């Protein structure tokens, strides 16, 4: 746990009692702050109270009695409709931050590296932490991924904090000092929360405002918004390391054919690393290589560490093989852009998709429909996706994940196509049937692993 002694004796409201909010409340209580916490969900309030966190309805409290409001980034505070407490806090001029800001204030001298982008953040964060650790550096990874910011351990002076930062967290952070800031890509996502694409890009761009003098901005240049940001950073005189998987870069890190190139010179063959399949993972590896080089590691050290990466759950995770069929859990793929990165890796796909649809649907994936043997539709998006697939891809309406798994297994075993893959890559949020994409992926894994125990097809 990170100590936040600067808030001793302060009166702090904590809004949201998920992972980050609960960790924040615990850290504040340990520091001697006066904490009042709230969550609109009854179950979260009950869990917080059982953990010893004081629960108070903030609507009944005069906000001029508080010194700070710590906001859980998953709760809207501006768009599409701000939470009433956010509006009251602004009217009362009550400072509003997230837990990452408290981490930055608590550890102003710590070496921090940040990763953001629409897709690939979690893999890049864990891969970078893995490389630093393999090369002998004390490291802790968290933030939007895994461990909440204030649940991270305190590291020795040569330690590195690798932080995955969402656009929501970047909006509520002000004091970070970063040695490396990575922006992988920017494609439409969470637009409702940011008032449109311009607001979303502005939130992502903020990561570079926190670079210390001499710090490195590592930026993917394979999309228009990121190329525009690179041009802006160049004008500001910020050190930029460009990465690409679309073309060879004479200056930068690239891997258009799967061989990682440093200023166009070969370093290692990413295609030989099973845990990093596909161009999207090559982009992640390029970003990690660039960041690790900025931290002083040698190409040989980095290449050796990349080769030992075990992979990350719910990101093209191989969860089983049955009758020669590979079962891939890509539950993290909640939009079409993320799904595309998985589809291009396989030729004979039995595709499980659906859930709570996001803007844009799956029409953009039509160029890859030839890879799909059959689609199995679940959740709220079933009819919308059926309309897109009709006449182009054979599909079955399955309603639920367990029925989709059974149907996919039956058909894939019957077809007996060499190299067949059953791919859970939903192109949707999970909240219509699951609590999170992790819950959805874990359920898929359990269903597949039940095959070994004689589970019914």
From Swiss-Prot:
Gene Ontology BP annotations: cell division; cell wall organization; peptidoglycan biosynthetic process; regulation of cell shape
EC number: 6.3.2.9
InterPro entries listed in its UniProt record: Folylpolyglutamate_synth_CS, Mur-like_cat_sf, Mur_ligase_C, Mur_ligase_C_dom_sf, Mur_ligase_cen, MurD
Keyword Ligase: yes
Pathway(s) it belongs to: Cell wall biogenesis; peptidoglycan biosynthesis
Database matches in PANTHER family: UDP-N-ACETYLMURAMOYLALANINE--D-GLUTAMATE LIGASE (PTHR43692:SF1)
Role summary: Cell wall formation. Catalyzes the addition of glutamate to the nucleotide precursor UDP-N-acetylmuramoyl-L-alanine (UMA).
Protein name: UDP-N-acetylmuramoylalanine--D-glutamate ligase
Natural source organism: Paramagnetospirillum magneticum (strain ATCC 700264 / AMB-1) (Magnetospirillum magneticum)
